[in-house]
C-alpha cells in the first residue's frame, strides 16, 4: 500500500468537491488529456480518463464510491497497462480551516515481466504526491 498526504488551506466541502468532480481534474492536473463521465448519481461514478505518460497516452476506466466530505473509494476495472489491479481511497478530514487529504493506493502488477515492483511503487507514489500538490496549489489559489 502507498500513502501520501497533503494539508490544503480550504474547507472540507471545497476540497472534497474538487476531488469528487472527476471532470474538474482536467483543469487541475496537466497530464489529464480527457475525461468521459459515464455515470454519476452523486454517490456512484463511472468514468474513463486518458492521461499522458512517458510511453504515450493511457486510458483507464474507474468506478468511484463517494461519501460526501469524507471519503472517495476507487476501483479500476480497466487499470493502467502493466497492472492487473489498482484500487484506492482518498479521505478528507477538516481541522480548523485546513483539510487533510490522504491518498492510498493498492496495486498488483500483471506479472514480473513488466518490470521491478519498486520502480512501479516509486512511480505511483510520485504521481500521487504530484497530483495532491496540484490540487493544493489550485485550491489555495482560487479562494
Task: Annotate the PLM regions.
Residues 13, 99, 141-142:
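Surface-exposed interaction/gating patches
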Residues 26, 36-82, 126, 130-143:
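Glycine-rich portal/gate segments that line the openings of hydrophobic small-molecule binding cavities
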Residues 2, 32-35, 47, 74-75, ...:
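Short structured motifs
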Residues 1-43:
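Hydrophobic ligand-binding cavity/cleft-lining segments
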Residues 5-9, 36, 65, 91-93, ...:
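Generic structural detector for well-ordered beta-strands
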Residues 1-3, 57-61, 84-88:
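Short, surface-exposed coil-to-beta transition loops
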Residues 77-130, 137:
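Beta-strand/loop substructures that line and gate deep hydrophobic ligand-binding cavities in soluble
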Amino acid at each position: 500500500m502507498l500513502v501520501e498526504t497533503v494539508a490544503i488551506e480550504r474547507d472540507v466541502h471545497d476540497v472534497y468537491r474538487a476531488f469528487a468532480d472527476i471532470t474538474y481534474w482536467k483543469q487541475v492536473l496537466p497530464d489529464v488529456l480527457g475525461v468521459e463521465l459515464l455515470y454519476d448519481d452523486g454517490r456512484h461514478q463511472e468514468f474513463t480518463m486518458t492521461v499522458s505518460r512517458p510511453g504515450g497516452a493511457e486510458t483507464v476506466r474507474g468506478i468511484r464510491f463517494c461519501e460526501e466530505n469524507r471519503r472517495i473509494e476507487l476501483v479500476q476495472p480497466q487499470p493502467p497497462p502493466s497492472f492487473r489491479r489498482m484500487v484506492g481511497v482518498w479521505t478528507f478530514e477538516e481541522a480548523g480551516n485546513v483539510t487533510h487529504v490522504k491518498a492510498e493506493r493498492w496495486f498488483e502488477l500483471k506479472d514480473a515481466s513488466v518490470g521491478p515492483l519498486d520502480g512501479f511503487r516509486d512511480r505511483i507514489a510520485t504521481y500521487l504526491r504530484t497530483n495532491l500538490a496540484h490540487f493544493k496549489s489550485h485550491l489555495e489559489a482560487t479562494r
